[in-house]
């Protein structure tokens, strides 16, 4: 009998996942459907369950705060997600998230194990039969200081910052280490009051509680200081190589607990959970800013401070995370490491880890859906393994094209193009390469959308990487900051010739910013960042036949087996999901071409 499990995550990066007998049918973020960046509350995504099944065996909910404490509907006493699932007929009306024993419920609330869900997502997609998971995240599950009163407010709460778990099949996850951060102070706190009910039963090897910002919250504080939104840490990462060491800054991270752990210096970084922490500008007057002007218009001193502080937080944070990786291996003896949580999207840090881990023969898997959307995957897979006890080791997730399978017809393509005043003509790879080498931007739209924040050839903007001013040109068209780097997609068989892969066989998820091999940078200047690195995606014919063939054609003409690749969106917008999203983006920008390789068609917008 087929088992259907639907899972949702409710916070920012909200999304939904559907499993059929343990395999992903689709995984989608709410923002792709609503067109609102970082949208939460995945009500639109939930309705998509009905496209595949009229009934769920389980609806699993992930977040950072239990359903019982949030999202309540007046009068009914229930939550909006259970209510919607009942309204759609996906679950039985007699069921309740608040009735019966945990194992008998149809609605399963896993919001109390946020970090464990990040770990489960990474472990089940790593290909390892056992592993140790490190989760480095902003603010995970909210846990009240006093379990008896259960008060949920900023004075009584702590939040997960960094966690270590041992992982094994079918559902063997043990919490070994956890750093809980908060605003404090916390007088007279008993350690056994802090973990969630489920995790307290497991016991801990080590639990840290303090009133400081965690690794990610400190990074977010610097991100905010640099003029960005706290969730835009990727911009800080891109800005960091423009900075340099600066002796006038204090260290961001310092010893805590008599040197037993490292934490953000609360004199420099002030925690403001559950929001981002803030840089203490009043204590360090030379850091004070007078306005929130863009990085292109602020005074020279502030610009230098932002660049140098970005450099500092990147360097220091990756050193701290590396220490935690070694701590995880030391605690378990397991040299299979999986990394997840928001920090795992830091491709500069991920590459930094490889050098040190290779010396100790430690294998690293970095989960490509490490944002909170990944907790829905973790929740669904954990529920599947808990109910079936399936011990079969899952294979490495080489591809993450996990969106919907749209069934467009030629008439659909023509109708959508006509609505925006665009034309549709026949096209093949040779013609697309001619456009690219003539310094045209060409977008590509095909198949299922990519899961996670990286475009991997199904929803991508493409350009010629050999064009010297390509980075500035495309950043201007996408309306992005000048310092934002771009990625490259390369034929796997040539990857080691062009980049130092640090022993990796492939990099299909674009999770590492790699050093170029000698003499390479000048050949592909558009995708080489100021520090000489490039975030790359390796491509095989088996992973993406159409995209591979296009890169192969580009290689034949240019002797460069790489295409400039960036996400198909404009600044501040989500990745395009539907063909209409794609054509609308052309209409609202200076881009003119969208290639549909499955149909051999090219949509052209005369802008």
Region locations from a protein language model:
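Glycine-rich phosphate-binding loop signature in dinucleotide/nucleotide-binding domains
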Residues: 53-54, 128, 328-333, 438
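Phosphate/ATP-binding catalytic cores across multiple sugar-kinase/actin-like superfamilies
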Residues: 311-335
